[in-house]
Amino acid sequence: MKKILVACGTGMSTSTMIAHKLQEFLTEQGISATTAQCCLNEIPLNCNGMDLIVTSMRTNSDYGIPTLNGAALLTGINDDALKQQIKALLTQ
């Protein structure tokens, strides 16, 4: 089972919406994954053992884990491209 950390400014509303959209997509694709949420500044404390980090905004930090900006899951703009990136990372 894959593990995904979803982070936003406060670790509440936006990350919850992204995590929900992400779970819907992963279920449709038959990819088994769990999500955890946190705020952006807590990523270093919560990223151990994660396979992917999805954030609500850009981050320049390198956590040693693939990190994607998940804003497209909220807006729907270019979300297909993001979903394909997520699928590729989780099925490699």
Curated annotation (Swiss-Prot):
Subcellular location: Cytoplasm
InterPro entries: PTS_EIIB-like_sf, PTS_EIIB_2, PTS_EIIB_2/3
A Pfam family it matches: PTS_IIB
Domain of life: Bacteria
A single GO cellular-component term on record: cytoplasm
Location of the PTS EIIB type-2 domain: 1-92
GO BP terms in the entry: carbohydrate transport; phosphoenolpyruvate-dependent sugar phosphotransferase system; sorbitol transmembrane transport
PROSITE patterns referenced in this protein's UniProt entry, alphabetically: PTS_EIIB_TYPE_2
SUPFAM superfamilies listed in its UniProt record: PTS system IIB component-like
Enzyme Commission no: 2.7.1.-
General function of this protein: The phosphoenolpyruvate-dependent sugar phosphotransferase system (sugar PTS), a major carbohydrate active -transport system, catalyzes the phosphorylation of incoming sugar substrates concomitantly with their translocation across the cell membrane.
Domain writeup: The EIIB domain is phosphorylated by phospho-EIIA on a cysteinyl or histidyl residue, depending on the transported sugar. Then, it transfers the phosphoryl group to the sugar substrate concomitantly with the sugar uptake processed by the EIIC domain.
Protein name: Putative phosphotransferase enzyme IIB component SgcB
Organism the protein comes from: Escherichia coli (strain K12)
